């Protein structure tokens, strides 16, 4: 990556301290946070709300149904128990939908290229990661946007590899420098795989591309059997075009992914007030109904094939019709969808942590933090779009990945919650300090015992005093993040082209 010149502030050890912290991380058994923290304490819907939404979902599937499935999908779902109405829309009786829910593989594992990065999607276990199809990269220094390229995807993957609180990497940008759709899909996938060993999410343009994709995956995994044993990518599949229509080409891609052993994210991305009802409750009902129809589709082909129920409804600013990914309503939508999917005991994914702000600034901070923590507290398994995304999904910032890693650490600490037991209630420590000690807990054995196991310390966020901040020439977080981006990429393996030349056989 070319270093972008930025206005520098004189620092006093901050960057060196961050390097030392990365070089000597805490052991996993001491870390206060990590992937798979258990959420579910935030419940925006009451039990009666859930029942009413559930009733509407089954009514929508049975009476309205979905249109435009490919012939192969229609045949498979009819055989599973769906039926075609007089209007030629595919309808789903409640018992058929519940059968699909029962057939769905629960507690799935999304594998990394190494076991360290495996994600176990048990009920309410929370993981944060990237996603998106931004066509621009944010130039934070010049306050400009430029078209995103394959190298940017690789750079983002390399950064994600080193961020403890970014647990998976779904392609966040489009390689606009690759015009041919097949070449773009293959180069995007390889840029991701080259940059990180964490689980990867990608999309594919056409069904016929899955064969060369599979050949690449088999080579990287060391054979088809090893790939199928530990599939380390998933297909983000927009199988539905809201409202209540199958996306024919995406469905054909999904069918091929199932045959190839690729886990599928069933993605319903309606926009409230445009392609979904303006009311939040109606949008939740429609999105969940669409995803449940997708579960019928998948299980009619291969019962138990690993898939994630991806309710991704977005919010519109109804004054303009533009998307508003950083709104409070977006946080509510994602959290409520998580609650509904938990009600059905399904592996869940939704989008949160986006912002409408164009740059990493105060607006982006409150937009990202408020929505990301709500999704985590609600127990969403996979929180997509939670790092780096700006401008309502139109721009992606590498510096924001660094800042958001700190933010997500605080979100995960909130998700973890408070342990209350005889040890944490600290009666003996209080008694000792008050009756025998100096009247404070600084340096107390109990304080030292929990300072690393209960508290999360950010990497680049500034917690210095105003005096120290002034003496350090008033550092700004965007400059610290930019330095961190350069550090991450300076000590990174070769570019995707170099890696491909060294790894891939000449016959590939």
Residue ranges and their predicted role:
Residues 491-498:
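Conserved small/polar residues in nucleotide/adenosyl-binding loops
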Residues 147-377, 381:
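Helix-rich catalytic cores of soluble enzyme domains
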Residues 503-508:
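Hydrophobic alpha-helical segments, chiefly the membrane-spanning helices
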Residues 2-41, 110-124:
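N-terminal basic/disordered segments at the start of proteins
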